[in-house]
């Protein structure tokens, strides 16, 4: 995965490319940001740029060729100088895993220019494993770089965070995700509908099929319509049950189902705002349901529309804080 193939994050990718080219890459870095937005791919791009046999140098930047023997082996996960550490079956990264890569990192690269240790989901490091990293992060081997990839940097020990500069990766734009999906064979309509509910995560967009996301959108649309005409709390709470219906992958949790419905609802409410404000309908994320959107626009306009959009955002944030799933669904329908 050369730098040029990473979707979005242009400023950070340019910074990494310049750092590799100028030999100014810090010996340890935290790549932080939401799940599924390309942090791990960016880390692999660094590893390729450091070890590519035929790198392309353009002024003050560098990029891997992506096709040489070294790049191919890194992409396949079999390069001896690129070590990937991931959580085990129990969901954590144990101290033995960390000790092994620390020992290997002390030696000169076997065949490349620099060893790269990529710790994916670094927030899964148990406390003992994090503590075992401290000395290495404080006095890193000159021929190695440690890249800690995490969606929850706040769970890392302060002593770990203080030793590693942090790069903050932001959610991808819906346009970036739609382009990536179309490159994978999605129609433009499908790609835009999926991207609108992906919450800035290409990984999330790729995990769910277009059909699953359309089902989720139908549920969200139906709940908005039902709640808009319900005058008493009892009827609204009945609608909350629909938000907990199973939509998506078979192994998904109730929290996952509610989350996908709320992201679909957020996408619909954004489109409603487009119609209410008289903006160009060509920017709608869900143009195939424009008649239904226009009916919702008759209700969710002005202050009520703004309150509904804010309530959905707050509900999604509450889910991320592990609030009770049923409690979040019930609270939301009473706010819409």
Give the role of each language-model region.
Residues 121-125, 153:
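Conserved Walker B
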Residues 88-95, 122, 166:
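Flexible beta-alpha connector loops of hexameric P-loop NTPases
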Residues 1-49, 70-73, 106, 142-145, ...:
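Charged, glycine-rich active-site and insertion segments that engage polyanionic ligands
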Residues 131-145:
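Conserved catalytic/switch belt of AAA+ P-loop NTPases
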Residues 48-63:
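Post-Walker A helix-loop "phosphate-sensing" segment adjacent to the P-loop in P-loop NTPases
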Residues 111-116, 141-147:
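Loop/turn-to-beta-strand initiation segments
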Residues 61-93:
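AAA+/P-loop NTPase substrate/partner-engagement loops
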Residues 15-19, 95-116, 124, 128, ...:
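Conserved alpha-helical scaffold flanking the Walker A/P-loop in AAA+ ATPase domains
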């Amino acid at each position: 995965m050369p730098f040029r193939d990473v979707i979005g994050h242009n400023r950070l990718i340019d910074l990494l490319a310049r750092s590799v080219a100028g030999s100014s890459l810090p010996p340890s870095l935290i790549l932080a940001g939401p799940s599924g937005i390309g942090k791990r791919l960016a880390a692999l791009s660094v590893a390729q740029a450091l070890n590519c046999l035929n790198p392309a140098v353009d002024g003050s930047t560098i990029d891997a060729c992506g096709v040489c023997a070294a790049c191919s082996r890194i992409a396949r996960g079999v390069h001896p100088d690129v070590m990937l550490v991931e959580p085990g079956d129990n969901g954590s990264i144990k101290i033995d895993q960390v000790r092994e890569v620390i020992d290997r990192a002390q030696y000169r690269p076997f065949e490349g220019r620099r060893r790269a240790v990529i710790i994916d989901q670094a927030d899964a490091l148990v406390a003992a494993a994090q503590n075992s990293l401290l000395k290495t992060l404080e006095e890193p081997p000159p021929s190695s770089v440690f890249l800690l990839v995490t969606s929850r940097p706040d769970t890392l020990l302060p002593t770990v965070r203080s030793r590693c500069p942090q790069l903050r990766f932001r959610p991808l734009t819906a346009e970036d995700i739609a382009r990536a999906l179309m490159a994978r064979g999605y129609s433009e309509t499908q790609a835009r509908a999926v991207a609108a509910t992906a919450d800035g995560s290409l990984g999330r967009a790729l995990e769910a099929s277009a059909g699953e996301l359309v089902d989720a959108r139908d549920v969200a649309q139906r709940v908005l319509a039902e709640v808009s005409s319900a005058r008493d709390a009892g009827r609204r709470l009945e609608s909350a049950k629909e938000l907990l219906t199973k939509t998506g992958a078979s192994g998904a949790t109730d929290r996952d189902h509610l989350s996908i419905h709320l992201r679909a609802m957020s996408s619909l409410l954004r489109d409603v705002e487009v119609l209410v404000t008289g903006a160009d309908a060509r920017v709608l994320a869900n143009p195939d349901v424009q008649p239904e959107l226009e009916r919702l626009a008759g209700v969710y306009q002005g202050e009520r529309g703004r309150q509904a959009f804010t309530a959905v955002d707050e509900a999604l944030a509450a889910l991320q804080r592990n609030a009770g799933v049923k409690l979040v669904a019930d609270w939301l329908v009473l706010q819409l």
